[in-house]
C-alpha cells in the first residue's frame, strides 16, 4: 500500500510538472514549451500583458531558447519574454501590430530580430538590455519607437529609422555604445530626450528634414561624433543636446534660429 501511495504521488507530481509546460496566454491564445526549450504561441488575438509582480507562466523556466509566435497573434504582451536570458531566436508573424513594453527586456542571448511590416508600435523598453543584439531591422510600418526601446543594447552597430516613424522616444537608443551610424527618416518630427545619450561610438548621424525638435541630452556623451547637419525644419534644440561631443555643427542656410558653428 505504501509503495502504491508513493507511486501515485510521483505520478501526480509528474503530471503537475507537465501541466506547467502549457496553458493559455490570452483569450484565444495558447502556449506550449518543449523540453528542447522551444516556446510556441498559437491562436488568434491579443496576448496577455504581464509585469514583474505577475510574470508570464514560462518566466521561471530558464530553458526558453526559441520563441515561435504563430500567425494570428496580434500583440506581444508587456514583459512577455522578459528575462528569458537563454533566448537566441524569435519568430514574429505578419499578424503582430504591437510589441509591448519590456517584451524582450533582459534577453541577454538574443542576437538578431526581424520585425515584420505589420508592426506599428515598439513599446517602451521593449528590447532594453539585450546585450547581444547586433542586427535589427525596423520596417516601414513602424510609427512609434517607445522610450528606452533599445536602451543599452551594447552590441548594436547601426540602425536606420524608416520614413514611417514620427517619434523616437526618450532614451530609445541610449547607452548603445557600439552604435556607429544612425539614419533618421524624413517623417520623424521629434527626437526624444536622451534618445542617443552615451552612444560613444557614434560617428555619423543623418537627421531627416521633418525633425522640429531635438530633445535635451539627445546626443549628449556621443564622444566620437564630430559634426552634424541640422535641417531647416528644426526649431527646438534642448539643453545639452550635443554636450560632450561635436565641435561643429551645420545648419541649412535658411535656418534663422540656429546658425552654423565651427569651433
PLM region spans:
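A composition-driven surface/loop motif
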Residues: 25-26, 48-54, 58-60, 68
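STAS-typified acidic loop motif
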Residues: 29, 35-49
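Boundary of Sec targeting at the N-terminus
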Residues: 18-20
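Sec-dependent signal peptide recognition
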Residues: 2-8
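N-terminal signal peptide c-region/cleavage motif recognized by signal peptidases
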Residues: 14-16
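Surface-exposed ligand/attachment interfaces on beta-rich extracellular proteins
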Residues: 22-30
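Structural signature of tandem-repeat unit edges
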Residues: 38-44, 62-75, 85-98, 108-121, ...
Amino acid at each position: 500500500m505504501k509503495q502504491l501511495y508513493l507511486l501515485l504521488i510521483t505520478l501526480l507530481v509528474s503530471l503537475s510538472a507537465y501541466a506547467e509546460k502549457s496553458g493559455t496566454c490570452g483569450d484565444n491564445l495558447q502556449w506550449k514549451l518543449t523540453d528542447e526549450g522551444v516556446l510556441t504561441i498559437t491562436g488568434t488575438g491579443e496576448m496577455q500583458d504581464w509585469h514583474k509582480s505577475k510574470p508570464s507562466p514560462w518566466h521561471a523556466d530558464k530553458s526558453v531558447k526559441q520563441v515561435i509566435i504563430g500567425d494570428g497573434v496580434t500583440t506581444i504582451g508587456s514583459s512577455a519574454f522578459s528575462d528569458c536570458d537563454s533566448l537566441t531566436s524569435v519568430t514574429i508573424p505578419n499578424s503582430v501590430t504591437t510589441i509591448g513594453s519590456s517584451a524582450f527586456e533582459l534577453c541577454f542571448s538574443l542576437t538578431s530580430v526581424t520585425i515584420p511590416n505589420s508592426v506599428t508600435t515598439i513599446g517602451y523598453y521593449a528590447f532594453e538590455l539585450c546585450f547581444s543584439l547586433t542586427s535589427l531591422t525596423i520596417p516601414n510600418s513602424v510609427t512609434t519607437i517607445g522610450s528606452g526601446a533599445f536602451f543599452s543594447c551594447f552590441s548594436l552597430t547601426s540602425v536606420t529609422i524608416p520614413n514611417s516613424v514620427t517619434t523616437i522616444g526618450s532614451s530609445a537608443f541610449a547607452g548603445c555604445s557600439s552604435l556607429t551610424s544612425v539614419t533618421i527618416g524624413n517623417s520623424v518630427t521629434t527626437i526624444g530626450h536622451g534618445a542617443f545619450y552615451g552612444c560613444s561610438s557614434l560617428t555619423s548621424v543623418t537627421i531627416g528634414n521633418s525633425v522640429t525638435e531635438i530633445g535635451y541630452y539627445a546626443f549628449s556623451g556621443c564622444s566620437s561624433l564630430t559634426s552634424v547637419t541640422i535641417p531647416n525644419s528644426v526649431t527646438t534644440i534642448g539643453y545639452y543636446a550635443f554636450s560632450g561631443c561635436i565641435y561643429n555643427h551645420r545648419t541649412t542656410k535658411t535656418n534663422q534660429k540656429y546658425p552654423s558653428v565651427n569651433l
